[in-house]
């Protein structure tokens, strides 16, 4: 019921009052509608604040300690920087280079914002799959070799950058000489199908020759012939050197079983291989280079950095490590400057 006190004697004031009441009613409805819209926008904003903004695909060639550590470092860095606003999808090729191609193509089809390629085969596949999506590599020894670039000077000029796992090969040659100065021959055991391994073989041979060693190469094509090639290397060498090689890392247990029986010590190119079959190594931290790769990804995704102009980054420091269990087999004692492999 509406009280009309003060308006009963005149129709005009009553009419004006009704008009005012209608206007007030419309204003209330508009205000209420505005409040509903504002509330809805606030709810949408709150709901989307934690939603995924970036989709990153990680292609890892194989599962072994070095590559696993690099992937974990990448994930840790990127999630620390972007939190819930990044979705990281990890796919493992289980050592199959062909699977790397399939993985890369799936990431391209999904329209990911960035691809992290862990190991050379993963990088080559990703680079072949897209020229537009930013690609960051890690666990790559030499990008010029991996991407078949001429006159490579540290910047690719295309949609690829990343971090290198190249350890100082001259320092590794010196480590071998410090531990085995009386050895005459060094056998280099590696996979001929890995370009980065071939690069390391060429480079370290120069340093080993400078110490007076006779250098012999023993290459296998895949895991199927690791055992017989390792046996031959042990029979014909005083010491074996294994570069950073994914196939060797996958087959470290097989190599170790043969080398221990033959009493042929192994110097490894990185701590993952040293953990499996080596006496000692001068190594980088794969977790650290993975972490650095994650920081590069953040700069690309969040700050718009141009991947084609980002220089390849290298490990800032190297660590001497040894394997106590294997060292005991050869009666070797290591000083405080060596850490134990984990």
Annotated model-derived regions:
Residues 273-325:
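Flexible loop/turn connectors
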Residues 143-185, 284-305:
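Hydrophobic alpha-helical segments within soluble ligand-binding/sensing domains
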Residues 41-45:
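C-terminal motif of bacterial Sec signal peptides marking the signal peptidase cleavage site
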Residues 55-76, 83, 89-99, 193, ...:
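Extracytoplasmic "Venus flytrap"
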Residues 195-264, 270:
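Pocket-lining segment of extracytoplasmic ligand-binding domains
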Residues 89-151, 245-269:
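Beta-alpha junction/loop-to-helix N-cap segments that form part of ligand/metal-binding clefts
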Residues 56, 74, 161-209, 306, ...:
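An alpha-beta-alpha
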Residues 47-49:
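Bacterial signal peptide processing site
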